[in-house]
Amino acid sequence: MSLVAASLHVASESALGPACRFTEAHVTEPLAERGVHHCSLSLTHAGQCQVAIRWELCGPVNAPLLIVAGGISATRHVLGNDVDSSEGWWQAQAHFLRRYRVLAIDWLGDGDGIDAPIDSRDQANAIAAVLDALGIAKVRAFVGASYGAMVGLQFAAAHAHRLCAVVAISGAHRSHPWSSALRSIQRKIVELGSLQCAEGHGLALARQLAMLSYRTPKEFSSRFTDPVALEGNRAVCPAESYLEACGQRACARFDAASYRRLSESIDLHSIEPESIRVPLSVIAIDSDQLVPSEDLAELAVRAPDAWLHVISSHYGHDAFLKETSAIGAALNDALDA
């Protein structure tokens, strides 16, 4: 199916208007498309900029449309599909997401040559620009996790007329001061690596430090039970090989500038919950160190029309990737409400 035909069909769903009455799709053969939208965007902290926004659209063509966004490591490839059969970053939620047509983008600043401060609202405006290019007037919901939840909140505030609801998983109206402090150290590690002509080493170490905040002491205590051991004349802790593998994956995924700018973008994020004028479902994790459930409770209290669901997990911030059943059930509740 051509881009125009697919876009017109999705747009026709949005003609239902503010009531947002969508019917479940019964198409068994999903279609997928990828593209790049070139346009000029006014960036919050950097002014007018020519951008190339990489997008992917997949799922049954007559299904309600979701915008889906994850953490800074997430890409436009959410699920394996006809364009790319490899597993997407949220393949674990395939059972839930297959009911919908899914639109996602690669973040501004992710390997596209933009080396300037990027705000979460810039990402929201980039998604709106893609919707314009595809001829899509309105979507069923914006489902965001981690950084993607922050972008979803910005989208809801700036483009409320374009969606019926927003689901924010482990992403609040601001960054917690403890989390911002931790990320500032990570960025300094990356910068130090670059100064020492060891960019990859600095990036890998920064990611290893980040992993400690994504997970929890409880998970580590149950997962890494061996004692610290001497290898030659060096003490090695049982989690080191796991953390080193995480660091190497980050090196394969990011360049230093992209990692630094997207990390900054998390900390630059700020929005008044009162400005979110669409129904908001907030999903918190009780063990999340990066985005404490107290912050998400505040978001839900201050937003005009919000619902809060707290999931118990020992995975911390990464629960949105690991707690498949609990997250899927919460998503069902949010979008069926």
Where do the protein language model's features map onto the residues?
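Conserved acidic catalytic loop of the alpha/beta-hydrolase fold
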Residues: 121-140
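Catalytic active-site module of serine/aspartate enzymes centered on a nucleophile-bearing elbow/loop
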Residues: 298, 305-337
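Conserved strand-to-loop "acid loop" that flanks and positions the catalytic carboxylate
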Residues: 282-287
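N-terminal cap/lid subdomain of alpha/beta-hydrolase-fold enzymes
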Residues: 56-110
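Flexible "cap/lid" loop of the alpha/beta hydrolase fold
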Residues: 167-196
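Conserved alpha/beta-hydrolase "acid-adjacent" motif
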Residues: 289-295
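Alpha/beta-hydrolase
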Residues: 187-278
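Conserved hydrolase catalytic core segment
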Residues: 139-177
